């Protein structure tokens, strides 16, 4: 077979994050919480704008006026020379920038990037957190959001009124002192796309749609979904919008109430997602198309170095291993059974699980004995005998393959976080558990692991590993649909696309007509639909507005997912955490630390309007409208090395909170276990325009 060169955009999925500032830093390109060579700083930190890999520090989080900076998703191009069907890991890949000379003698003159962002949340179906993807099984669908708008998700009237679609935007990346942009996703900027020949085609007839009519917009107009820029080497930067919301005005002339955490009719936000494509233009006039990536515009990273026990990477990797034949030496594609002779690498497959367990202490209220136990887990090394460690026999790990009753057992089983889709407690993925089983059986490699990842593949893993997995109710960056095999390009070995790449639906922009919606209701799960995803088809399964979901998913009873109690204790009132690594609950504040001695914890969300009569509502804004307006005041957890020159690198502390007050002395952070009140008081009436918080 002759050698062919293919081009791919990496990361396959990257994340732009909201901020109220015009300023920004760059998406992290290292994996949260993991050791990095030559430094005490662990992975997950974003990168300073205008640099290759310089980590941000405390001073980079906010601008001079105290506004929260945005995180730009940086995309790169890589070339792969393939002489056979592809494999994973490929281990190769050479970055391509403007000015790169290829082995065949061609030189890249410029890169034409096209991105299409959209928000379909208000036109989608309600999210049923207790069911997850199963709410779409057997041809069924949940109730539509905004049912007062007549029709189906494909009805033109609903598409015009409920979908935010500015259309595609194009930008040309060249080599220079400064990059290009911004090119904004607003109504004033003409839609455009690559013409496939090295230029850009304007689309003046593209039917843009934004929320219209009389609207309540508490933090500014919802008039953009973000912007594009390039850097000095022609790489792409995608910036999210500013985390704004808009609500329709009801018949009484007041904003529609926020009545829940996930599905709020009459509300919009500026989250978005969509495909990222690239056309390489060479000095000889020829062009090449790269395999596209996907961008998601989402919540800020409030704890970028705190690793999730189950990350999006763990879920995506598990799906590809067990259902898409990613690594036949690990899992038999014919039977779906793990290969008993496979030996995971300790540093590659085991260490991340142990490290994640240890890092949870910085965002939850663990008692000292639990902190010590988690530290003991993190201290396990590749040379230790598994039988002589605290993890001997995996006694404390909840088995995802076991009798379903085990999912209802809390202490002493780990993780001690809540599950999703009706499961009381979180489990590691089946692939993660297999790695742990092999380690427990002494069937692991103390050095090395699978073949090393290539640089583009490493970006894929790092990007996804910095996001919340496991508990999609509906999630923070993405939802349960990320685990569905049919959203991905599956013929990647033959085409050279590489794994983990979302399949974009082919869109012919030349057919766009003013006044006629261009996008449809789009993809829904558990259907025989292999056309691919349209812009907006990932984010539409998230909460609307996103702030109410972030606010509510803090501390809960197990009955939030089932009617039962913790099977280990029989106590239905014991409280547990939802998203502790991505949505901090209890934190140590850096400014309270004296001589590297930690002070008492405080709630991440604190100050006026946060006092909770019932402990299950701690660390939340009691009025959800406060969450919509004050989300940007929440502090960020950083490692000591990114705070100042004196803080211990072993500490991960909150900095730059702008919430008023030091914390309510009547709402202290008590060490776990703690319980909800047995009989919470009836909710008090709220004025129009607000709603009552409902714990999920």
Residue ranges: model-predicted function:
Residues 2-696:
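Aromatic- and Gly/Pro-enriched helix-to-coil junctions and flexible linker segments
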């Amino acid at each position: 077979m002759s050698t062919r060169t293919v081009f791919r955009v990496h990361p396959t999925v990257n994340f732009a994050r909201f901020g109220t500032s015009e300023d920004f830093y760059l998406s992290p390109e290292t994996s949260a919480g993991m050791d990095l060579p030559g430094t005490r700083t662990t992975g997950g930190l974003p990168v300073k704008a205008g640099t290759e890999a310089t980590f941000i520090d405390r001073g980079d989080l906010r601008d001079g006026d105290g506004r929260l900076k945005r995180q730009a998703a940086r995309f790169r191009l890589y070339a792969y020379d393939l002489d056979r069907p592809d494999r994973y890991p490929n281990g190769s890949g050479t970055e391509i920038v403007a000015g790169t000379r290829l082995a065949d003698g061609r030189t890249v003159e410029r890169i034409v990037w096209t991105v299409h962002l959209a928000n379909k949340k208000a036109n989608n179906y309600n999210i049923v957190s207790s069911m997850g993807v199963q709410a779409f099984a057997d041809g069924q669908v949940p109730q539509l959001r905004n049912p007062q708008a007549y029709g189906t998700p494909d009805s033109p009237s609903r598409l015009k009124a409920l979908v935010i679609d500015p259309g595609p935007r194009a930008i040309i990346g060249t080599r220079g002192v400064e990059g290009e942009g911004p090119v904004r996703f607003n109504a004033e900027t003409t839609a455009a796309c690559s013409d496939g020949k090295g230029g850009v085609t304007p689309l003046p007839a593209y039917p843009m749609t934004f929320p219209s009519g009389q609207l309540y917009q508490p933090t500014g107009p919802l008039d953009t979904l973000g912007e594009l820029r390039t850097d000095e080497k022609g790489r792409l930067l995608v910036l999210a919008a500013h985390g704004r919301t808009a609500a329709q005005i009801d018949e009484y002339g007041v904003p529609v109430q926020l009545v829940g955490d996930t599905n709020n009719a009459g509300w919009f936000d500026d989250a978005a997602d969509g495909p990222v494509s690239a056309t390489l233009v060479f000095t000889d006039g020829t062009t090449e198309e790269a395999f596209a990536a996907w961008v998601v515009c989402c919540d800020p990273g409030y704890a970028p170095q705190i690793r999730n026990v189950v990350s999006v990477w763990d879920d995506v990797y598990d799906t590809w291993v067990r259902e898409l034949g990613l690594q036949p030496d690990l899992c038999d594609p014919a039977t779906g059974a793990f290969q008993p002779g496979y030996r995971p690498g300790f540093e590659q497959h085991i260490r991340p699980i142990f490290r994640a367990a240890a890092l949870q202490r910085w965002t939850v209220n663990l008692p000292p004995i639990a902190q010590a136990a988690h530290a003991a887990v993190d201290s396990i090394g590749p040379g230790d005998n598994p039988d002589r460690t605290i993890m001997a026999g995996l006694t404390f790990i909840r088995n995802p393959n076991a009798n379903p009753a085990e999912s209802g057992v809390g202490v002493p089983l780990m993780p001690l976080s809540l599950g999703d889709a009706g499961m009381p407690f979180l489990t590691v993925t089946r692939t993660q558990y297999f790695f742990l089983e092999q380690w427990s059986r002494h069937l692991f490699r103390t050095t090395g692991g699978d073949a090393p990842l290539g640089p583009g593949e490493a970006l894929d893993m790092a990007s996804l590993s910095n996001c919340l997995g496991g508990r999609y109710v509906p999630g923070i960056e993405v939802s349960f649909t990320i685990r569905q095999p049919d959203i991905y390009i599956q013929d990647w070995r033959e085409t050279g696309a590489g794994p983990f790449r979302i399949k974009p639906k082919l869109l012919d922009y030349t057919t766009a007509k003013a006044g006629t919606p261009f996008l449809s209701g789009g993809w829904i799960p558990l259907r025989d639909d292999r056309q691919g995803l349209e812009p907006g088809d990932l984010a539409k399964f998230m909460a609307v507005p996103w702030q109410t979901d972030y606010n509510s998913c803090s501390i809960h009873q197990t009955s939030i997912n089932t009617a039962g109690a913790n099977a280990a204790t029989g106590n239905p009132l014991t409280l547990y955490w939802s998203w502790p690594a991505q949505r901090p609950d209890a934190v140590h504040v850096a400014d309270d630390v004296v001589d590297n001695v930690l002070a008492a914890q405080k709630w991440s969300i604190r100050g006026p309007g946060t006092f909770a009569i019932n402990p299950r509502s701690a660390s939340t804004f009691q009025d959800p409208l406060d969450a919509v307006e004050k989300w940007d005041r929440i502090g960020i957890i950083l490692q000591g090395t990114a705070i100042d020159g004196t803080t211990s690198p072993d500490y991960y502390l909150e900095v730059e909170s702008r919430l008023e007050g030091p914390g309510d002395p009547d709402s202290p952070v008590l060490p776990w276990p703690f319980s909800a009140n047995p009989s919470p008081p009836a909710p008090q009436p709220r004025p129009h325009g607000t709603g009552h918080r409902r714990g999920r």
